Regions:
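Active-site metal-coordination/substrate-binding segment of hydrolases
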Residues: 80-148, 168
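Histidine/acidic-residue-rich, glycine-tolerant segments that coordinate divalent metal ions
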Residues: 140-222
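Short beta-strand/turn micro-motifs at beta-sheet edges
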Residues: 188-192, 300-305
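A short beta-alpha structural unit
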Residues: 316-320, 346-362
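Short, solvent-exposed beta-strand/turn "edge" segments of beta-rich domains on protein surfaces
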Residues: 219-220, 302-309
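Active-site-adjacent substrate-binding region
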Residues: 231-232, 361-380
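N-terminal helical capping/dimerization or prosegment-like subdomains
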Residues: 1-97, 310, 314, 329
């Protein structure tokens, strides 16, 4: 039987198993979901890779309390290259369940595509590895290692701390990271570098307690307004990220991302402008970008006539290849502390930067162009 036919025959099993994995609410934040959900997902991953020949499988505790699944599968030749398969089983929180068009933790097919929290990022990639290994059977000419982490979405540094302390255990000739995207549906792409990132929570304090807006608004500083003012300093009117000390003028010299395609991919509403004075590719791949992920403040429904004494926001800073994420994080913190208005106190707390990217391939095994197997599988 041809490999393509074997894969087609395995898709029913892949869908059923992906549905099982998506149903596990593995958000690596105990404030939102019980840790037992991540433990279930880790055990699921371990059990299923045992079915495809991985040995020495174990759950490795990492510095942030999450568990990484490690395993190895020797090939027919010990001298053959070693390939490390990477994925993560944790997912982003669903936020507002009612805003979903399909249930977040129930795999649902719509127009030939499968939807659910983690269906693509990154539980779908776990099933991709499993399905490929089942289809190949014993025809794998390399040695395999596996690492599936459990806190990638939180950016709390579990795997980042684990890797340098277990360098020999994880050493490989190539690392297969499929937590990326294609150029378009049906058009495969090789990602040779990733953005780095840093997460920062900024808190603004203005009053020791709430006070009535009818009596004190005007001269009394509003911490929420101060936070809004502070966040507004992170972009100029054109939408360029303007963190003091970070270069926002670099350009991208690779394949461009067509603006109209980006508008469609990013779901921009009619009439909404793209941000920045560079090309789409410049803004996404060559320059830093700050996103406001969340704000703690009173909801509109139930809000009172009170001046807010404190407010905070969680920020996500993405940095391009070649920019040091630690230095970028430090620059963001310094900017926030300097830009707080009206003498309001501003405090920032950071998570460890999740990645230190570099421009271009790190070594010979990384392809500059798609390998022949991708061309054959895509038929183009």
């Amino acid at each position: 039987m041809e490999l393509r036919d074997r894969i087609a025959g395995l898709m029913g099993q892949a869908r059923a198993e992906l549905a099982e994995l998506v149903a596990i609410r593995s958000v690596a934040d105990p404030r939102q979901f019980p840790p037992s959900e991540c433990a279930r997902a880790a055990r699921w991953v371990l059990d299923h890779f045992a079915q495809v020949g991985f040995t020495d499988l174990r759950l490795e505790e990492t510095a942030d309390g999450s568990q990484a699944v490690y395993g190895a599968r020797p090939g027919p030749d010990p001298a053959a290259p070693t390939v490390l398969l990477y994925a993560h089983y944790d997912v982003q929180p669903p936020l507002d369940d009612h805003a979903w068009r399909t249930p977040p933790f129930q795999l649902t097919e719509v127009d030939g595509r499968w939807y659910g929290r983690g269906a693509a990022d990154c539980k779908g990639n776990i099933l991709m590895h499993l399905t490929a290994l089942r289809a190949l059977g014993d025809q794998v000419p390399v040695n395999l290692k596996l690492i599936v982490e459990g806190s990638e979405e939180q950016g709390t540094g579990g795997l980042e701390d684990y890797v340098p302390r277990h360098a020999d255990q994880l050493r490989a000739d190539a690392i297969l990271v499929c937590d990326t995207g294609n150029a378009a549906v049906g058009v495969p792409a090789v990602t040779v570098s990733l953005r780095g990132l840093a997460n920062v929570v900024v808190s603004v304090e203005a009053l020791s307690s709430e006070v009535h807006s009818g009596m004190y608004s005007g001269p009394a500083p509003d911490a929420l307004a101060a936070l809004i003012h502070l966040l507004a300093t992170l972009r100029d009117r054109a939408g360029n990220t303007t963190v003091t000390g970070l270069d926002n003028t670099q350009t991208w010299d690779g394949v461009p991302w067509p603006p109209e395609q980006f508008r469609t991919d990013a779901c921009l509403l009619p009439g909404v402008s793209l941000l920045g004075d560079g090309t789409v590719s410049d803004m996404v791949w060559a320059r830093p970008a700050v996103t406001v992920l969340g704000i703690d403040c009173p909801p509109v429904v139930g809000s009172a006539a009170a001046i807010q004494p404190h407010a905070r926001a969680r920020l996500n800073l993405r940095v391009p290849p070649g920019m040091d994420p630690v230095e970028a994080q430090d620059a963001l913190v310094a900017h926030l502390e300097a830009a707080a208005p009206w003498g309001c106190g501003s405090r920032s707390s950071e998570n460890p930067p999740a990645s230190r990217s570099r421009p271009g391939p790190a070594g010979p095994p990384t392809p500059r162009s798609p390998p022949p197997c991708m061309t054959r599988s895509a038929g183009r």
